[in-house]
A protein has these predicted regions:
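Active-site metal-binding motif and surrounding structural segment of the metallo-beta-lactamase
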Residues: 69-74, 79-166, 302-319, 331-335
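Active-site metal-binding loops of divalent metal-dependent hydrolases
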Residues: 78-81, 127, 237, 282-284, ...
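Long, structured stretches of catalytic cores involved in phosphate-ester chemistry, encompassing
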Residues: 297-397
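Metallo-beta-lactamase
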Residues: 75, 80-81, 271-314
């Protein structure tokens, strides 16, 4: 019996008496979870008209690959850092540790990308190594123009992939809201080297992410065919988009600070595809101190400007994030997250995500992994009823929205190998259909 089989058998007792995720009649379209007809089969390839996001599991960082309805593609983050050195806090590194994350991610993208190795957009949510790679961890180094480049994260993936345009919060001056190097843990230096290299090698274009913009991230191949698809930039550099389209600077009081929390600088998006809505905002969570000595919760301020969505990526991997007002504002039917640590999706976060006081509707919490140690620790907690059991074995989470946006599917795909075998799937109707 291997470690994973032992874990499966050992966890039966703690889970007895915990209900499985339930489906409200009217938002389920077919059998769910392990009984779904896709289980055991290869994940179907993207088809024109679908909006698909792959939350790629590596166990060491965050990465998402988007395929938009007309085939426009985007790699959002490509993290790698020494998470495997965290001892008992580490989660499974999959498929194995023989390759670094950047290479695994590039191989995954090439399998599912209709354009194979060509990717329209690269976007880095913020300058942290678990989202971009770092100088001290990777598949070696290379010399270029008098610089030593770390083959890690984004740069390693770019050995196989070619990006046309890149969005970054700091480009070109890297000084908003304060000089970005004051927030740097090494990832910014790594990224700036990678950008310079890819601009010279591939002619990659750089753009500053504009908070408040609608359509900066645009369909590049046949936008006219999908007028109901739009991406709105809602957060970045500590600013948020208000409902009226204006922009509020949450850090206006801190422009002379010596250091700021990089997580609060994260880039955030809301996608609308017909009736379907999706939210993602990197690690957007911070509690900066105000001039009067009190603290402001950035998620609470953002919540005032948001409406409900169908699927939401959990902020900051669920590490003491997702304030109750934000959960209540988003009211997601499905919550998902990229995970690389036992401390991700902490119990307090899960309690808020599962709170029926925040909103009464059923919901599915579908992280890339919900590790065994956490299940022992949280045995008997009510929030376990909302967690997808497929996460117990870890896997890629793939969201596929049908053409037009009326229905969507969330599937787990094995990360143990590159077979793309589906291990569980859930079908839903977008909430505003028929509203």
């Amino acid at each position: 019996m291997n470690r994973r089989d032992f874990v499966k058998s050992a966890l039966v007792a703690p889970l007895l008496g915990v209900a499985l995720p339930v489906v409200a009649q009217g938002d389920a379209c077919s059998p769910r979870g392990a009984k779904h007809p896709l289980v055991g089969k290869k994940l179907p390839a993207w088809k024109p008209g679908e909006f698909q996001i792959h939350f790629i599991y590596t166990g060491v960082g965050e990465s998402m690959f988007w395929i938009m309805p007309d085939g426009t593609t985007m790699l959002l983050d490509c993290g790698d850092h020494p998470a495997i050195n965290r001892g008992k806090l580490a989660v499974w590194v999959l498929p194995n540790g023989n390759r670094h994350a950047g290479e695994w991610i590039a191989r995954y993208v090439t399998r599912v990308n209709p354009a194979k190795t060509d990717v329209d957009y690269l976007m880095i949510s913020h300058h942290h190594d678990d989202h971009a790679g770092c100088p001290s961890w990777g598949a070696g180094t290379r010399e270029w123009n008098g610089r030593t480049l770390s083959v890690s994260g984004v740069l390693q993936a770019a050995d196989a992939l070619k990006f046309k345009t890149c969005f970054d919060r700091g480009w070109p001056s890297f000084n908003e809201p304060i000089p970005n190097e004051l927030c740097d843990d090494g990832a910014l230096r790594h990224l700036r080297d990678a950008y310079a290299y890819l601009m010279e090698r591939d002619g990659m274009k750089m753009e500053k992410f504009e908070v408040g913009a609608v359509g900066q991230i645009a369909l590049r191949h046949d936008a006219a065919a999908f007028p109901g698809f739009a991406i709105t930039n809602i957060t970045g550099n500590g600013k948020i988009r208000r409902r009226d389209g204006s922009v509020r600077d949450l850090y206006a009081h801190a422009h002379n600070a010596k250091r700021l929390n990089e997580n609060g600088m994260s880039l955030g998006l809301v996608v609308q595809y017909g009736p379907f809505r999706f939210y993602s905002a990197g690690d957007f969570y911070d509690t900066p101190k105000l001039p009067d000595g009190t603290r402001m919760n950035t998620e609470v301020e953002l919540a005032k400007e948001l409406d409900s969505v169908d699927v939401a990526k959990i902020n900051h991997h669920g590490h003491h994030s997702m304030s109750l007002p934000l959960v209540a504002a988003l009211k997601a039917r499905v919550w998902t997250a990229c995970m690389w640590d036992q401390l991700h999706i902490t119990a307090d976060t899960l309690e808020r995500l599962s709170s029926r006081e925040a909103y009464p509707d059923p919901r599915l919490v579908a992280p890339g992994v919900f590790p065994p140690e956490r299940r022992f620790e949280d045995a008997g907690k009510p929030f376990l009823a909302d967690i997808a059991r497929e996460s117990f074995d870890a896997g890629h989470v793939v969201m596929t929205v049908a053409p037009g946006g009326a229905t969507y599917n969330v599937a787990y795909v094995t990360a143990d190998d590159e077979s793309m075998k589906v291990t569980g799937a859930y079908d839903f109707m977008s909430r505003s259909v028929g509203a």
